[in-house]
């Protein structure tokens, strides 16, 4: 049964570590809450101090634990969320790059294009065109 599996996991060799991660007040739980908040608020301007305070951590501890969990800084994580959502908007909702970039929180279209190309390897327009071509080829 599911309860038996859960019992065996929690009483096994990694059980203590897993329990500390799942503990309501653990760093892992606080980072999970910060990630959930960032996912809902990625388009807003954020201050790391505010996010750290929101989850009850000092800025330095928040940075350290966030990077340990995500392998990136909170700002890099927000940027990745914004770029991913902008790409989704351009591909699926057929928004142009300027509209998509503004909707996900970028103030500068040129900054958006630079960061997009750095992550996806192409300008937004070329990436969307190439992605649509590969989707139509795959559908044939």
Language model features by range: what are they?
Residues 2, 6-10, 14-46, 50-55, ...:
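A short, Lys/Arg-enriched amphipathic alpha-helix from helix-turn-helix/homeodomain DNA-binding modules
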Residues 134-140:
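C-terminal regulatory/oligomerization modules of transcriptional regulators
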Residues 119, 131-134:
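Short, leucine/isoleucine-rich alpha-helical interaction segments at C-terminal helix-coil junctions
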Residues 8-14, 39, 45-81, 101-126:
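Basic/polar phosphate-binding segments, predominantly the helix-turn-helix DNA-binding elements
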């Amino acid at each position: 049964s599911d309860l038996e599996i859960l019992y065996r996991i929690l009483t096994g060799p990694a059980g203590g570590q897993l329990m500390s991660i799942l503990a309501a007040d653990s760093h892992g739980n606080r980072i999970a809450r910060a990630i959930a908040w960032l996912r809902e608020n990625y388009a807003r301007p954020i201050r790391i101090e505010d996010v750290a305070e929101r989850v009850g951590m000092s800025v330095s501890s928040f940075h350290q634990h966030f990077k340990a969990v995500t392998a990136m800084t909170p700002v890099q994580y927000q940027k990745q969320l914004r770029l991913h959502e902008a790409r989704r908007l351009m591909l699926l909702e057929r928004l142009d790059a300027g509209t998509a970039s503004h909707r996900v929180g970028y103030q500068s279209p040129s900054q958006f294009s630079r960061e997009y190309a750095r992550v996806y390897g192409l300008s937004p327009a070329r990436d969307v065109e190439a992605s649509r071509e590969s989707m139509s080829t795959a559908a044939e």
